[in-house]
Curated annotation (Swiss-Prot):
Subcellular location: Cytoplasm
Pfam family, one: YbeY
Chief location bin: cytoplasm
PANTHER family named among the record's database cross-references: ENDORIBONUCLEASE YBEY, CHLOROPLASTIC
NCBIfam families given in the database record: rRNA maturation RNase YbeY (TIGR00043)
GO molecular function: metalloendopeptidase activity; RNA endonuclease activity; zinc ion binding
EC number: 3.1.-.-
Protein name: Endoribonuclease YbeY
Amino acid sequence: MQGIDVSYSDEVGFLTKGDRDWEDWIMQLLLMAKKEIGKDNAQEMSINFVDEDRSQAINRDYRDKDRPTDVISFAIEDGDDGLDLSMFTQDPDFTEDIGDLFMCPSVIERHSKEYGTGFDREFGYTIVHGYLHLNCYDHIEPDEAKEMFGIQGKVLEEYGLPLYPDQLDEGRGK
């Protein structure tokens, strides 16, 4: 399995907080999710850490929801346009640009307290959730939600950040 090239923009200084190597931690979760969905080709993406004002502006402008949110994903390929990229992904030199994530650490922190999950589990949930959206997974329909949340749960459990059993249907939250 080839890797994921992640470029970062950190408007809030998140990556320098604490003594954790956030980029390494994020990469471990992304690679586990990539393996779980069976993606073998090289990928590239960006992760942008933003404040609540920027998160709210993006959410309002692109999703018509006037509130900050934990993660917003802009997938290059959403699966709805009928493009078959398989011929490209077989080329060992091809790197698939899957898109961009905009993450708001302060909203993730608030959610971790509201849901009683702890920051690490909530952050892990959010990064895997966003990554799956960039790979054409969604949770609008119940069967899609079951598949997507099942993948998230498996990845988080394997990493040591399990979803609680009562969260599997709704994805998170008690």
